[in-house]
């Protein structure tokens, strides 16, 4: 019967080549001004073109601007601290890290140990890495949106063993301590 049959339906709609939500909204508003509510009721199909290189550049600039702004306003701390994971087997460490939702091409990392100018970490993909001071020194403590603490002078001012943090790929250092931006 139809009730027992597996659901095999899937969306066959057009998939955009690039994220362009603002352009799509601008087009929708223009069409609404022209067609009113008929826009939604008459089965219209609308295609528009943009220069994808410019849109990608705009998206990248906004993304980088948001990250820079968020970093300037301080580090809000680790996702959580799990001291029990430091000596746990590799598969348990990686599973705990993989259970945390991903953000873009970032990784979650478990801080295994902290030295004066470095932190040893396990990434969600199982690799071990060292976070150098240059990847951490930006992380002055966030107090509120208008106030943050002094710049840290050593890694222990920012991280402790057992911290679970996010790191993102960086040109200057392999991995940069990161946090998911909280902008409105």
Region spans (language model):
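Active-site loop and adjoining helix of the penicillin-binding protein/serine DD-peptidase-beta-lactamase fold
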Residues: 42-50, 151-160, 184
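Flexible glycine-rich surface loops and low-complexity tracts that mediate binding to linear polymers
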Residues: 54, 109-114, 150-175
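N-terminal post-signal-peptidase region of extra-cytosolic proteins
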Residues: 93-100, 143-155
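A short macromolecule-binding patch
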Residues: 126-145
């Amino acid at each position: 019967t139809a009730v027992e049959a597996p659901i095999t339906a899937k969306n066959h709609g057009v998939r955009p080549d690039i994220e362009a939500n603002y352009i799509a909204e601008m087009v929708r508003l223009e069409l609404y001004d022209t067609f009113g509510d008929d826009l939604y009721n008459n089965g219209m199909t609308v295609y528009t073109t943009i220069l994808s290189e410019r849109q990608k550049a705009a998206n990248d600039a906004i993304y980088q601007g948001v990250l820079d702004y968020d970093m300037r306003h301080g580090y809000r701390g680790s996702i959580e601290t799990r001291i029990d994971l430091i000596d746990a087997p590799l598969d348990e460490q990686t599973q705990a890290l993989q259970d945390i939702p991903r953000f873009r091409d970032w990784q979650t990392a478990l801080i295994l140990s902290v030295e004066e100018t470095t932190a040893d970490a396990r990434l969600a993909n199982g690799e071990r890495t060292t976070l150098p001071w240059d990847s951490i020194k930006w992380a002055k403590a966030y107090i509120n949106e208008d106030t943050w603490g002094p710049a840290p002078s050593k890694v222990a001012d920012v991280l402790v063993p057992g911290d679970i943090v996010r790191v993102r790929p960086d040109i200057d250092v392999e991995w940069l301590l990161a946090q998911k931006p909280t902008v409105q």
